[in-house]
Amino acid sequence: MLQGVIDTHQASLRGILATGALVIFVALFLATFQFQVLCLPLINGRKRFELSLTNSKKRYYADAKGFIQSGFSQSKNGFYAITENGRELILAPKFADDIRNDKRFNFHTYREHTMLPNVAGLDLFQLNDLGKKILSHVIGYRLTHNLEWHEVPLRNSLLAVISQQSSRVFLGKKFCRDPTWLKINTDITVLAFRAVQELRVYPNLLRPVVGWFLPACRVLRSEVRKARKIVEPIVQKRRDYKAACLREQTNPEQFLDTIEWAEECAGSQAYDPTVTQLTIALSAMHNTSDFLTQLVFDLCERPNLIEDLRQEIISVRKKHPWGKATIHHLKLMDSVMKESQRLKPIGLVNMRRRAENSVELADGLIIRKGDLLMISSANQWNPAIYPDPDQFDGYRFYNMRQTPDKKNLSHFVSTNVNHIGFGHGRHACPGRFFAAAETKVALCHILLKYDFKLVGEAPPKILAIGSITSANPFAKIAIRRREEEVSLGVSEP
């Protein structure tokens, strides 16, 4: 009898486990289906016998450009596509002005849906209202002294430069000289985006679980713990110091760095100082290092343009003392930067939003509540807008600046429907002014202090991962020290 009870119990347990597994499977299966009738075509959907969107996402990773071109050939206004983030709506560039300042289209909720902040270790991408407020409020390791030609991995070298340069501005001399902090910054910049990329192929329900075992997430959590040991003692020491000054009725020293600005903005509200500092560093470093890498590759192919830029720096430096105002006179450099970004933006699409309500746009196009949407960057390569759009013309925006009605559109930091490298409208990149200044300062040092050229005859191939484009992280350049014609008047950090 006892054996019978045991057998019955085991059978029941197996039944419960089987039922639970079936429920989970069905939930995952149904989560990938779309029951709504779409007003625009869907491309790259599931193929026959595919039960999830995983293969669709992998196909998009491999050939996003082809799918986007195919989509617009079917529907000029836009289309739905299974992207790395699931189903998203890709709209024609003409709709950029319609959504740019419309509060019903929200960048922050889009980010929360796509950057996976619910995965342990990826809370760098999770900003509550206070975090958004702080980030909005707040917003090298030298290449070489070798006189002989030698090869360096450009992307990693520039990432180190940007890490030190940003740390000097944000946190002061102590942080920009701390090799542990600089390594944490560069490692997190690489690991965070790698982790998101790897997790996106998994169904939403599985991502938090997979994140505990994914190597990139595990290392990322370890790096955050290391960062806490650096940031938290400094924050606590300052809080104790201010409390002592308050008791003694003396004026505390004024700290001009992002730690202090975050503290001021947060006030008495609780927040995570370490994650805040890492998020600021991540925001400053990732896109800037990628952009500067591609910019140097572009210049390597155009030695005459390198010389023109050097002459501009020398001319401006002789007329103006080195400082913030000086870089605004580097108009050719500004044009070259904008042209590089035009040809290789950070992605094939931009202006990513989530529709908070159903909205009717021009042409009667209906955007449904909850839709994830983005604008195609296709106007940046449109021959009707930019003559010879496939050709790199460093003087393109310099010449445009001479035309009164186009002058304001020619600046590197300006945004419009024909150039959305920084987005457009109320959610345009708030850090673009700092990024522009940081890039110009770095480029002045590189151009005056180094000769550089490509390794091999072919230019490094731009990498495409889904809708994201990336300067080749594996390519090297040959570089050697040169004697600069003028001093930039900057002491070592």
UniProtKB/Swiss-Prot annotation:
Q: Which GO MF terms are attached to this record?
A: heme binding; iron ion binding; monooxygenase activity; oxidoreductase activity, acting on paired donors, with incorporation or reduction of molecular oxygen
Tell me the route in metabolism or biology where this protein functions: Secondary metabolite biosynthesis; terpenoid biosynthesis
Give the Enzyme Commission number: 1.-.-.-
The record lists the membrane-crossing segments as 15-35
Localization, UniProt:
Membrane
Binding of heme, residues:
429
Task: Please indicate which superkingdom the organism of origin belongs to.
Answer: Eukaryota
Q: Which CDD domains match?
A: CYP503A1-like (cd11041)
List, alphabetically, the PROSITE patterns matched. CYTOCHROME_P450
Q: Give the way it sits in the membrane.
A: Single-pass membrane protein
Q: What happens when the gene is disrupted?
A: Abolishes the production of 15-deoxyoxalicine B and accumulates predecaturin E.
More details: The 15-deoxyoxalicine B cluster is a rare cluster that contains its own geranylgeranyl pyrophosphate synthase (olcC), in contrast to other related clusters which rely on a FPP/GGPP synthase localized outside of the cluster.
Which protein is depicted? Cytochrome P450 monooxygenase olcG
**Which organism does this sequence originate in?**
Penicillium canescens
Q: Which gene encodes it?
A: olcG
